[in-house]
Amino acid sequence: MIEHVYRRTVAASLVHAALVATDDERIVRAVESFGGAAIMTRTDHLSGTDRIAEVVAQLPCRLVVNVQGDEPLIEPDAIDAAVAPLLDDATLEMSTLCRPLAGDHELAAPSVVKVITDLTGRALHFSRSPMPGSAAHIGLYVYRRDVLLKLAALPAAPLETLESLEQLRALAHGIGIRVIPTRHGSAGVDTPEDLERVRQLLAPHEGVPYVM
């Protein structure tokens, strides 16, 4: 699964390099086995945001794209769509993606994170609970480097802990998140059922190292 995520990420035209941040040596070996780059981090991070901040603190970059390892079908064009607004508007701090909910079953599913926005596309709230007028959140974030490092230094917010959603720390501390709608569906793997669905989608391509 990690190879699909990695190769789809580097295929995005606005991504210049990719690096897997992990605290598991097995993942490092897996990434290196297909020619990818990976780095070990501390084991005590509360979220992926905190983990990549440890790595980014050592790197010279302006923007950071956080593609979560459980998004094996993320589209390179969707990644570019999330990056582009921060290149075009210097006032934006963070961005992420959303897609239409597939139906009431997704609205009710705690594994499907929902997001609602204001009229400008700025996130108002993320939740695992049903919310009127919400869309399905796709687990990808783009940050300005300084915003990411600031965010990682802030304490966890009560709602972040309650919902187990790292992006709520940003909202709680007044960091704006632009939400970019996309029609590119992404099959995130959060449950055994999700994993089986992705396997079925990839089954026709068995033997191919990765599928675009």
Kindly give the residue locations of the regions a language model identified.
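Conserved core of the sugar-phosphate nucleotidyltransferase
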Residues: 16, 75-157
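A conserved hydrophobic position in a structured secondary element of the catalytic/binding core
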Residues: 22-23, 74, 143, 190
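Conserved alpha/beta core of the MobA/IspD/sugar-nucleotide pyrophosphorylase nucleotidyltransferase superfamily
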Residues: 134-212
